[in-house]
């Protein structure tokens, strides 16, 4: 089976065929660094991570570019309100973003492109649009893209430009479909911008949000590239405007495949600070939640469907991941025997790849994983898995986790003291004598000292770091 993805441009499932053999250019819309990213943002970033990982799993060589929007209406407003220089203000949120994606085990992009470092490319793109008659200077001295000059405007978001009011212009970065009009590609300086401006051939001002991504994506991936992703809220106006200005400038198709993930709800509703349902990743970690469990919740859904994020779902994910980790420890401790798990491993890989090839069907992929764990546990219970088979099981898990990113294969080595070993021995005596009260008491005492006991079906007990 080959990978099929849902192309938002045309709204249909298509076979993924890159432009250049096994090379894939991937542009992912990154954060606007005016605040800490919220959990809804990370739903998109985690899904994009799954996409990249599975492309690499499938043998593609991916070049991922992610933008960091460090100059726009929001960042300027935030810097002004905090009486900080724009670069100082945005730098702290860039830093926190990188810390957050590391906590969620999201692979770093090959290049993070900051808008403020690419002003010359943006100026050149605007100049090209003006030379070709697609952009004009307004009476406020800002430069606007004329959407009626671009016949295909609205094809991504489904907008009929023939019904638009002539002369309508929009200077702000974000707006609804009902307010569509010519959009700013270069914003003339005004007092609200304070010290944020560039003196260029276009005049004193700054780029519009949409021109930033067009200029940066084409610089690093070419005038036409394979994949552009983002949240569904980026579809309009941002991605629609990217297509218009890029294709108007080059005369070429901008992107072959567009992919968008749906919104994340919290407790069934849109996130709201007033309702106490607005979470940053840091908020959740401060509540004691495991980042990998948060990742599991974010990825374990069909990306084109809304997900309802509730704290209980993270607790359930923690239990699921803990079960996998216990399984890994159990398999790792098999040191003898001849049994293998060839059929179970083959079934896992076939089911996993079949699910992922169908528009990144993570829920069915994780279902295959847990069925595999159950089957192999049965083999172990019946002494039907040997050392070589166990090694193959671990290799299969590592292969699957190269996509999911939720497991930990780090072996923790530690030494117990003589006193702790004495407690372990006493606890084994109590367990064998079915003195469960004493057994549990000693188990809890050892756990308080950082040692967790795992009772194996063969009667042995494994001690590991708690």
Residue ranges and their predicted role:
Residues 10-15, 19-105, 454-458, 462-463:
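N-terminal, positively charged nucleic-acid-binding surface of large information/translation enzymes
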Residues 99-133:
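N-terminal, positively charged, Ser/Thr/Ala/Gly-biased leader segments
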Residues 64-65, 110-113, 228-230:
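Short catalytic-loop micro-motif centered on adjacent basic/acidic residues
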């Amino acid at each position: 089976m080959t990978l099929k993805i849902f192309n938002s441009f045309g709204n249909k499932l298509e076979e993924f065929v890159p432009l250049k053999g096994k090379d894939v250019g991937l542009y992912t819309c990154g954060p606007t660094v005016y605040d800490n990213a919220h959990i809804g943002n990370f739903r998109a970033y985690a899904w994009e991570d799954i996409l990249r990982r599975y492309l690499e799993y499938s043998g593609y060589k991916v070049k991922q570019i992610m933008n960091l929007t460090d100059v726009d209406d929001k960042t300027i407003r935030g810097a002004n309100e905090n009486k900080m220089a724009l670069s100082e203000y945005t730098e702290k949120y860039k830093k926190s973003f990188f810390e957050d994606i590391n906590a969620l085990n999201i692979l770093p992009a090959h290049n993070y492109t900051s808008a403020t470092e690419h002003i010359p490319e943006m100026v050149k793109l605007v100049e090209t649009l003006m030379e070709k008659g697609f952009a004009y200077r307004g009476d406020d001295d800002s430069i606007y893209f004329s959407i009626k000059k671009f016949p295909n405007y609205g094809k991504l978001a489904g907008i009929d430009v023939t019904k638009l009011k002539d002369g309508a212009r929009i200077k702000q970065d974000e707006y609804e479909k009902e307010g569509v009009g010519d959009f700013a590609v270069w914003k003339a300086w005004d007092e609200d911008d304070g010290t944020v401006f560039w003196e260029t051939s276009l005049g004193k001002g700054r780029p519009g949000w949409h021109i930033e991504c067009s200029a940066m994506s084409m610089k690093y991936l070419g005038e036409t590239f394979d994949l552009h992703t983002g949240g569904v809220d980026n579809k309009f106006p941002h991605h629609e405007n990217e297509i218009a200005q890029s294709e108007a400038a080059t005369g070429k198709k901008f992107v072959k495949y567009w992919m968008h993930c749906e919104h994340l709800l919290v407790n069934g509703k849109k996130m709201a600070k007033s309702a106490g349902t607005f979470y940053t990743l840091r908020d959740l970690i401060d509540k004691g939640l495991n980042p990998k469990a948060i990742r599991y919740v974010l990825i374990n859904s069909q990306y084109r469907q809304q997900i309802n994020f509730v704290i209980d779902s993270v607790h359930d994910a923690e239990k699921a991941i803990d079960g996998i980790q216990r399984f890994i420890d159990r398999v790792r401790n098999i040191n003898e025997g001849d049994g293998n798990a060839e059929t179970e491993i083959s079934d896992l890989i076939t089911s996993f790849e079949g699910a992922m090839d169908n528009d990144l069907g993570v829920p069915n992929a994780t279902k295959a994983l847990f069925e595999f764990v159950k089957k192999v546990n049965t083999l172990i219970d019946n002494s039907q898995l040997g050392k070589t088979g166990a090694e193959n099981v671990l290799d299969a898990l590592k292969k699957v986790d190269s996509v999911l990113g939720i497991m930990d294969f780090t072996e923790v080595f530690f030494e117990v003291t003589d006193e702790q070993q004495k407690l372990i021995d006493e606890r084994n005596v109590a367990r064998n004598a079915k003195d469960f009260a004493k057994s549990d008491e000693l188990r809890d005492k050892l756990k308080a000292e950082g040692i967790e006991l795992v009772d194996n079906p063969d009667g042995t007990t494994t001690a590991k770091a708690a």
